[in-house]
């Protein structure tokens, strides 16, 4: 059986690590190469802080998963916007797919830095695509799919109960704006470089080892510690999506021929108010 390699940028992150752990359990997986700059965006002095990066690939009880982590994952500490780093990795391992999850997390939205968001969503994307294009021109290697993890924040305010992929995109925050710009770069590159892509738009991901201070994590920790659940914007609706469902859907879209050069919302498909989420936690 032919073994396939996969590169996961931001592979120590919440979504990237979940995708990686699913990939390494596939029989045809050779190596999963994680490229991550090991940056911690959360203040370690905050009461909610736990460095889940250390837990995502350690203290694993599942023996098969633990064995595969030790045998199939290669870690690189580096900046995905660095041409030399990414070119060297991509040329060496010639991955079947690149899962580009690296970006400044949404937690930074309260203190936005435009250049930081641009580097996370745009500069890294351009650099990786540049490297892939150059390697393909110099060899017989052809990448199977470039998977770009975008965000439902590209839509801005939801005008309907459920968002569809071809709905208007009017992001309100710099995060969504940069993610949307990244999408257009991926599509533009594909037109002249013939790099097949899949764009994924997650929404309100939650689950084990989330440390990005999303509202789901914040309220859950409050509930565990018998704290008061303070709700702001109680009528605001979010399409909460379990991270393992998101990872599974992303991998299926990446491996399916019908997912080539397509964009997918991977969400639960219906909104739930933050207040109703809090009531569930109180039970």
Explain the meaning of each model-derived region.
Residues 1-201:
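N-terminal Rossmann-like NAD(P)+-binding domain of SDR-like oxidoreductases, especially those catalyzing
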Residues 43-48, 158-161, 210-213, 244, ...:
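Short aromatic-enriched loop/helix-cap "lid" or pocket-rim segments at secondary-structure transitions
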Residues 81, 154-155, 205-207, 236, ...:
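Conserved sequence/active-site signature of Rossmann-fold short-chain dehydrogenase/reductase
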Residues 181, 185, 189, 219, ...:
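Hydrophobic alpha-helix immediately C-terminal to the catalytic Tyr-X-X-X-Lys motif of short-chain
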């Amino acid at each position: 059986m032919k073994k396939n390699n996969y590169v996961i940028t931001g592979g120590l992150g919440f979504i990237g690590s979940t995708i990686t752990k699913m990939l390494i359990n596939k029989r045809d997986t050779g190596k999963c190469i994680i490229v991550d700059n090991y940056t911690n965006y959360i203040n370690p002095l905050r009461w909610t802080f736990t460095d889940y990066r250390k837990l995502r690939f350690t203290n694993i009880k599942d023996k098969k998963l633990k064995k595969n982590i030790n045998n199939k994952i290669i870690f690189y500490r580096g900046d995905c916007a660095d041409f030399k780093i990414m070119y060297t990795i991509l040329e060496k391992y010639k991955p079947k797919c690149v899962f580009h999850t690296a970006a400044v997390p949404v937690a930074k939205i309260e203190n936005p830095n435009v250049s930081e968001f641009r580097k996370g969503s745009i500069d890294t994307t351009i650099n990786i695509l540049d490297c892939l294009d150059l390697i393909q021109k110099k060899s017989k290697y052809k990448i199977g799919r470039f998977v770009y993890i975008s965000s439902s924040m590209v839509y801005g305010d939801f005008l309907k109960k459920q968002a569809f992929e071809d709905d208007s995109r009017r992001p309100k925050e710099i995060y969504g704006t940069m993610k949307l710009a990244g999408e257009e770069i991926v599509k533009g590159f594909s037109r002249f470089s013939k790099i097949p892509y899949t764009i994924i738009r997650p929404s309100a991901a939650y689950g084990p080892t989330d440390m990005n201070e999303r509202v789901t994590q914040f309220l859950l920790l409050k509930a565990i510690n018998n704290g008061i659940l303070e709700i702001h914007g109680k009528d605001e609706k979010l399409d909460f999506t379990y991270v393992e469902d998101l990872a599974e859907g992303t991998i299926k879209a990446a491996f399916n021929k019908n997912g080539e050069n397509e964009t997918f919302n991977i969400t639960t498909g219906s909104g739930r108010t933050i207040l109703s989420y809090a009531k569930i936690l109180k039970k």
